[in-house]
Amino acid sequence: MENKMKVQITTSNQEHIAGYREISIKDGKIDFQEISDNECTHILANNILDVFPAQQVKLCIMELVKKLRLGGTLVVGGTDLRIFSLNVINGMLQPNEASDIISSVSSMSDTGTIANFIREMNLTIINTQIGGVHYEISAERK
């Protein structure tokens, strides 16, 4: 029987999903001490990219990919800067809503840039979803 390790990377205000091994972000780093490289069949990191400064987002994705086994899937997500900006300019986000979002993130990136980072690491994009200003990208390591 194949060992299926499903991991969820969580922030301090995020609920744990049953059936996933929870890995927390501590001191600005993902605590992967107990996870070997190429061990995970599925990594759910759909709300974490905003936690890292812009200069560390690519490194974060690289760390996630190292833990993913061949055939494994990765889901990453964050706040899309371009969509956020358009929503502010077009009045779809009120100033207080925009301010709340800005104060809750360390950085914002755009979906295209993150998809390119993922492709650079030889993963295949399976799906991209956008809801409001949040995006999620699913990819597979082949």
Predicted feature descriptions by range:
Residues 1-35, 73-142:
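Class I (Rossmann-like) S-adenosyl-L-methionine-dependent methyltransferase catalytic domain
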Residues 39-44:
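Hydrophobic beta-strand segment of the Class I
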Residues 58-73:
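A short glycine-rich, Lys/Arg-flanked "PGG" loop and its adjoining helix->strand segment in the class I
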Residues 48-51:
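Hydrophobic adenine-recognition pocket in adenosine-nucleotide-binding enzymes
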Residues 53-55:
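Acidic-and-aromatic substrate-binding clefts and catalytic sites of carbohydrate-active enzymes
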